[in-house]
Amino acid sequence: MRKEHDSLGIQSVPQSAYYGIHTVRARGNFPAVSSVNDRELVKNFLRVKLACARANQKAGRWDDERVPLAIVKACQDLLAHFEEYEDEFAIPAIQGGAGTSTNMNVNEVVAKDR
């Protein structure tokens, strides 16, 4: 296990997990719920992040060009090999209507070095 911290405290995260503290917190909020978000929803989050990274790169909004390239590469890799990473997106389907936990989960997995 690795320890991660945020403004709410410290959580243990499995060492090999691509997700992080926000995902652990979201899963802990609904421990008895076994159904997770539909895989197509998660893939669409990845597609939106990919499109946003490209659009902002084209618009010159990044101070460091490595950032959008890393986001694009990660999103493409996750989409191309989704079955390998599907367990990393284990946010309970009942998590609140805003999708914040799903968004944070996807951000954590995209940001993780592969």
Residues covered by each model-derived region:
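Conserved, well-structured ligand/cofactor-binding cores
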Residues: 1-114
